[in-house]
């Protein structure tokens, strides 16, 4: 497979992942972190890191809006729930590996 095709496929996979996460607002970021070691914020941070590496100006808010499909504060007020004590404990336990 040539590099151009591979890049196009990877981009399609990324877009599909982001669309899937946008449709699953019931899945909380802390659960993603606890189970998979990454969340929507990680994806947005990686987007910003990639932009920075290419010399593309992008703010943290802009990268989050790309991933969330809306301003982060709006998503948080609509969909984010308070983390339970169990979720917080699992996060603290798994944090040492990040």
Outline where the language-model segments fall.
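Domain-level signature for proteins that mediate thiol-based redox and metal-cofactor handling
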Residues: 1-98
